[in-house]
Amino acid sequence: MSLVELRLSMRTYDHLTPLFLGNVETPGVNLVLDQASDLMVTNDRLMDGGFHAAEVSFNRYAIGIAKGDDSLVGLPAFILRNFRHRCWYVRRDSPLTELKELKGKRVGTDSWNDTGTMWSRAAMRDSGVDITDVKWVLGKLSPAVAQKAARPGTDSLPKGGAERLADGHYLLDALANGEIDAITTAATPEDIYKEDGRFRRLVVDYPAAEADFHKRNGFRPGLHIIAARKDYAEAHPEALLALYEALKESWAIWWAKTKRFADSAPWMAKQVEIMLRDFADEMPPYGLESEAHRKLAAYICKEQFEQGLVPEQADPGLLFKAFQNLAHAR
């Protein structure tokens, strides 16, 4: 029997390494893997038919569902997750130490609709500061960091408007010069890792702040998922289901290795213990059987609406409904 080809593009995150190395079987499927770098380019190639499935922004995917776009079938495969309290930056001499202190401040960002910056604003809102409580400044982070082009179908502007930096002006320079008070970005400034760097994280004890968010809300934010073209999913549902099982198996191999060795960082063993203690309901990062994953789906839909990213709130039950229908039809 001939194999069904499935062209998949995603980044080589550690838990996906077994799949990239060929250590996971995909019965009936000729899985052709592409190592993604620029996900906006990857998304364009997905929509143009260059890939059958790819890593996509969870926020932009959910925005599409909210607007009635069913061109993609999302898998409940949360391949990139993490908190974003850590992604707020200020000058090293700034008096700001908590997100609630951002009220009335000038805040810069290089992307409004990325999932990461959406979760950064969710963290800010969780602290009691609403979107319209700050003065937003949009612009390019630095000459070395490319700014993503706006996507008319999924991108929007801040409620209440925003100032735009002129061409040739950059957010990191504006922060250093005192023109803005803080920035949030997915691209961590290199100065953060220098003792004498110009910038520091706004939330100094971000692990404690993120742990508190997790305790109160019950989930770890999801950033990227896997999605397939609807035409491919409907033509080859078994191939998509085989991919889903392969992703789970890749994670299981990685997790077993991580627990056994735990040597990739000095206290990795402690991190493993924390994962087992506090995040058991979120491992593996697949499926909606987990209460934490259902809370995540509901929260992102609510947050998008309250941030003004969509005119109507998406039904969280619809985010992965198409994939669930494929699975149930087996």
Each predicted region: which residue ranges?
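Short, glycine-/small- and polar/acidic-enriched structural segments
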Residues: M10-V145, P152
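Short, surface-exposed acidic
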Residues: I131-W136, Q271-V272, P311-L318
